[in-house]
């Protein structure tokens, strides 16, 4: 970045920034059970060179759930951009939700991808499993803790993995996985679906997953559905 005064005289200021080694190509698909989805998400590049992907499912459906999940997502983004660490940021949001007079619960599914190293940090608070696809192999990221805003002493498990160009992260809310429980009892149909598909475009893949989940629900979603697909690519710029 260069900043120079107008005219022929003066001092120029230069700001040098290290180029990212990776970039994230993201596709999102949503389907609401009612008129307003209770799921909220955001994808943003932080000042420290990490890509923040956060998905939150407010308890219930409709406008109340949407308010809880949106507040969670917005506050997390603000705290991370201010420079807070993962544990402090999540515990701050947890405290804010617990201070509200009425019950305020929300899941947090969070991924931080280092655009220099390719390392991903996954934090899951009450959310359903996420999936990491590399070719025909699919890994599962899961946790068994309570949603945010339920207990004061919140456990924050963090899982780190190395990602390579072409790897795909798939994050979903429970409305996507739950219809498959009628098939396998666990709702992990998506793992097998991802292992079989060769689709690499995150936008098309997110639509395919939503359509499959809707078919499993026989055309009538029992809950809000959100799918985020994020592919890691080598930065050519």
Where are the model-predicted features located?
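Catalytic core of PPM/PP2C metal-dependent serine/threonine phosphatase domains
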Residues: 1-10, 66-135, 210, 214-223, ...
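N-terminal entry segment of metal-dependent catalytic domains or homologous docking segments
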Residues: 7-58, 64, 71, 156-159
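Short beta-strand-to-coil "C-cap" segments at the C-terminal boundary of structured domains/repeats
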Residues: 17-18, 230-236
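PP2C/PPM family metal-dependent serine/threonine protein phosphatase catalytic domain
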Residues: 17-40, 90, 94-98, 128-160, ...
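Short strand-connecting beta-turns/loops that link adjacent beta-strands
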Residues: 48-49, 115-117, 235
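Active-site-proximal, acidic helix/loop segment immediately C-terminal to a metal-coordinating Asp/Glu
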Residues: 60-82, 152, 163, 167-219, ...
């Amino acid at each position: 970045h260069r900043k120079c005064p107008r005219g022929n005289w003066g001092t120029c200021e230069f700001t040098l920034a290290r180029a990212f080694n990776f970039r994230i190509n993201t596709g999102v698909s949503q389907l609401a059970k009612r008129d307003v989805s209770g799921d909220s998400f955001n994808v943003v590049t932080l000042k420290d060179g990490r890509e923040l992907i956060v998905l939150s499912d407010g308890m219930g459906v409709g406008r109340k759930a949407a308010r809880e999940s949106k507040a969670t997502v917005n506050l997390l983004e603000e705290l991370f951009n201010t420079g807070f660490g993962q544990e402090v940021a999540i515990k701050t949001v947890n405290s804010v939700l617990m201070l509200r007079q009425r019950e305020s619960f929300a899941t947090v599914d969070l991924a931080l991808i280092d655009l220099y190293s390719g390392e991903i940090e996954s934090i899951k608070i009450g959310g359903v499993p996420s999936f990491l696809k590399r070719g025909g192999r699919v890994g599962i990221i899961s946790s068994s803790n309570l949603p945010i805003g339920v207990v004061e002493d919140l456990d924050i498990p963090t899982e780190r993995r190395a990602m390579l160009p072409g790897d795909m992260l798939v994050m979903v809310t429970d409305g996507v996985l739950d219809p498959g429980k009628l098939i396998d009892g666990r709702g992990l149909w998506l793992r097998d679906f991802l292992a079989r598909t060769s689709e690499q475009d995150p936008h098309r893949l997110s639509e395919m997953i939503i359509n499959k989940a809707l078919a499993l629900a026989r055309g009538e979603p029992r809950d809000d559905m959100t799918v985020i697909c994020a592919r890691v690519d080598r930065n050519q710029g």
